[in-house]
């Protein structure tokens, strides 16, 4: 049986630093402005990529990682604005679904957020979601829930924008800037994926201050969840 390769993608250095520190036998590779570390964790081959912020960066990085390393699955890690009821800074959302909240081709009969010829919502792999839920049982310091994560090329920081997004995605738990692009790329390339995000802010008028203050805490919680999940895959 071949060795399992797990790719983990984060947008910011703060979101992947802990993961890289836990890896063994690390080698660094680059592709244009993108970098990835290949190493080992928990008896598995691990590829850790820094995508940069935004959906285009995330899609390019994901396509490169899949082409270069042929991973068995992709995990997206990082921070997010918490939109789910009761979510607090530091809480973790297992993204079992991902969608674009800023795509509008409704004039041609598509659903809001739907890219033509693709699903309106991208479903995460149930085995990966299950491993994340198992990891949640031993995760300490924050609550964990599963649900929809929506992405757009904007940092959401107003209650008005939050209300608009919620009106289109009533079941949304979190909002950020990369997950849907990673999910779409994985779907198109036939690679199982899951999203793990920790809440750094509430996506309201204080989001910029909260994000700067709590990013490190959110990044650590998301990374710890990924590590516990990898131990169970």
Question: For each predicted feature, which ranges?
Answer:
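Structural motif
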Residues: 72-73
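A glycine- and small-aliphatic-rich helix-loop capping segment at beta-alpha/alpha-beta transitions
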Residues: 21-27, 67-68, 88-99, 216
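His/Asp/Glu-rich mid-to-C-terminal helical/loop segments that flank catalytic regions of hydrolases
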Residues: 203-233
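Mid-sequence, gly/pro-rich, charge-dense loop/helix-turn segments that line enzyme active sites
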Residues: 83-169
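N-terminal short beta-loop-beta anion/metal-coordinating cradle
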Residues: 2-69
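A C-terminal functional module that forms or caps the active site or interfaces directly
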Residues: 154-202
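Alpha-helix C-terminal capping segments
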Residues: 64-68, 86-87, 183-192
């Amino acid at each position: 049986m071949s060795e399992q390769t797990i790719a983990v993608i984060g947008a910011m250095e703060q979101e992947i630093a802990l993961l890289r520190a836990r890896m063994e036998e690390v080698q660094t590779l680059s592709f244009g402005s993108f970098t990835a570390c290949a190493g080992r964790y928990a008896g598995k081959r691990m590829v850790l990529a820094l995508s940069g912020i935004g959906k285009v960066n995330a899609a390019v990085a994901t396509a490169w990682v899949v082409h270069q390393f042929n991973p068995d699955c992709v995990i997206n890690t990082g921070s997010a604005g918490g939109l789910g009821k009761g979510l607090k800074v530091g809480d973790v959302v297992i993204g079992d679904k991902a969608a674009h909240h800023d795509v509008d081709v409704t004039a041609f009969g598509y659903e809001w957020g739907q890219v033509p010829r693709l699903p309106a919502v991208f479903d995460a792999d149930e085995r990966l979601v299950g491993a994340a839920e198992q990891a949640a049982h031993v995760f300490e310091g924050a609550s964990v829930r599963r649900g929809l994560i929506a992405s757009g090329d904007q940092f959401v920081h107003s209650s008005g924008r939050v209300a608009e997004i919620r009106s289109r995605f009533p079941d949304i738990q979190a909002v950020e800037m990369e997950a849907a692009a990673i999910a779409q790329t994985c779907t198109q390339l036939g690679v199982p994926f899951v999203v793990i995000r920790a809440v750094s802010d509430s996506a309201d008028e204080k989001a910029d201050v909260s994000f700067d203050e709590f990013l490190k805490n959110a990044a650590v919680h998301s990374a710890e969840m990924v590590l516990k999940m990898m131990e169970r895959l």
